[in-house]
């Protein structure tokens, strides 16, 4: 009926996002999330993990934790177009990036943001969710490919411009937290020794690196916020890895440990 349709129309027309909309988008049976799970299972798993980290961290500073979790679920939907080019979806020993030049690799990475924003509009995701797609990398440098380009340049000048995400930098506490959770989750998967002290070291390093590079300058996060966010990340990751290490001889702990590599 018109009465039922009016709030939906108003929300879309005036770019207001209600908790009801966010709750609907947080349902893992949402068609877009089902599509992500089917086409890019590694990215889907990563996004759920980022959601858990972001929700806890946002709660610790009194932000909108539901918004942070939902934003995290959708931040990487653009990876569905070429899932095999992203490390979390790759089979062992198969990385199509190795066949590309560093510049081409950077274009593939850049494209997941553009494609994600396109899909957000196509599926009529609220603007506040679209912001997570644009802002979760800010203007950060794709350091691995930039260094590779420098090595191959034989001393010629290589501009870092084409190896940077276009931004904008995170504008809200929630998008800034998802940027941090995204980096921390990806780094935690590479840990050979996920001891509490190593996790603490990695989390603090990643948060510090983003802060010092200026990526958080446009967000309202304070230093006290960053300290609380860091603690929240550590608590969750230590809990996850503790469960995996606890039972060294059980098959479940082995498969869980393998899944982090």
Where is each model-derived feature located?
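Long, hydrophobic alpha-helical segments that serve as membrane-spanning/inserting helices
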Residues: 211-261
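Generic surface-pattern signal
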Residues: 15, 19, 38, 134, ...
């Amino acid at each position: 009926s018109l009465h039922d349709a009016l709030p939906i129309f108003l929300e879309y027309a005036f770019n207001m996002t209600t908790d009801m909309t966010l709750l609907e988008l947080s349902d893992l049976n949402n068609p877009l999330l089902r599509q992500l799970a089917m086409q890019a299972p590694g990215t889907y798993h990563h996004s759920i993990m980022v959601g858990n980290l972001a929700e806890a961290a946002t709660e610790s500073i009194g932000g909108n934790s539901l918004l942070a979790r939902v934003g995290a679920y959708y931040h990487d939907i653009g990876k569905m177009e070429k899932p095999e080019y992203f490390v979390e979806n790759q089979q062992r020993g198969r990385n199509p990036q190795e066949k590309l030049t560093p510049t081409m690799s950077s274009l593939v990475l850049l494209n997941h943001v553009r494609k994600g924003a396109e899909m957000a509009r196509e599926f009529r995701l609220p603007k506040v969710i679209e912001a997570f797609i644009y802002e979760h990398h800010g203007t950060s440098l794709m350091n691995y490919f930039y260094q590779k380009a420098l090595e191959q340049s034989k001393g010629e000048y290589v501009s870092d411009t084409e190896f940077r995400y276009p931004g904008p930098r995170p504008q809200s506490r929630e998008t800034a937290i998802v940027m941090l959770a995204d980096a921390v989750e990806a780094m935690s998967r590479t840990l050979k020794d996920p001891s509490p002290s190593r996790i603490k070291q990695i989390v603090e390093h990643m948060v510090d690196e983003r802060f010092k590079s200026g990526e958080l300058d446009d967000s309202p996060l304070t230093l006290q916020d960053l300290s609380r966010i860091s603690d929240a990340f550590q608590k969750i990751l230590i809990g996850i890895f503790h469960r995996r290490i606890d039972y060294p001889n059980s098959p479940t702990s082995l498969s869980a440990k393998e899944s982090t590599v």
